[in-house]
């Protein structure tokens, strides 16, 4: 009799995805982030579900319901802060995961890469709408500012904004629909993750050398399951330390003030994980131009497979490209810092320079450096 693991129609799928999956023997810890993202998604759905049991999506009671969760619900404070800080962990891992893909040339798996970019957009949309739900000052004004950006779309912009708001301003209708979307999107994301994995398993994983590893594969279980468990353990230690000691470290104090449409906070800014994109948006003095730059700053990821001009897939043996990669990382950190600063000198200039460098590095410097490396290697 054949093993049930290999014959049962459902268990067979799990077996081929997580147990008997042939994996390259040399993938490093940079390949841990995929599984960590999966764990994060599961954690967010679970904590989110329990929060939704006590939350009310109404402008008059939303803020109070979050307070009620933290004060009166058994371990409500823990669930709330795990959910809020879990989102931060999610984005840290997302950025590491994407960075790994760029460094090692994983974007040459075009189907996997493009669905991954769409996943990033879906997660960003979910996080944005989740930030609106507590209905604090930054929730309300963040929602107002970001949704208002759509009014820059020629001809149909203003109508589109009012359609999204469900009225003439961010109000009860907006909060209710944002809650509905925030609840449904993670399940759509889960389906997209399955498609992401389906495409990945068509080709198999990349590896640090960027070479074909068919001649040297090992089973996913037990080698990479145990490695992933270590990653999850380290993640949980980090997350729980954050939740237990400094739960508000990454949040905004303004969000502890209930939403007030008559009082604008001095500095409107999104959560830290959107600051780089926010800095790019702010660095262009034209509304439509800013919105286009913001959109393109994320969608530029889809151009990586087209812009790849090196004869080698990975950056492991390309020191010049490695330098550019780390310049790009430093540039994004500068953008993140600038995004959290007030709009005044010298931050405006720094933001504009960093935004320009971001696009220039990806669109011009990286492809041309790769071509030069080909020449240097006489390829």
Swiss-Prot record:
Cysteine-cysteine disulfides: none
Cofactor(s) this protein requires: heme b
Gene Ontology biological-process entries: mitochondrial electron transport, ubiquinol to cytochrome c
Cofactor note: Binds 2 heme b groups non-covalently.
Membrane topology recorded in Swiss-Prot or TrEMBL: Multi-pass membrane protein
Top-rank taxon, per record: Eukaryota
Family to which the UniProt record says this protein belongs: Belongs to the cytochrome b family.
Full protein name: Cytochrome b
Species name: Ctenomys goodfellowi (Goodfellow's tuco-tuco)
Gene: MT-CYB
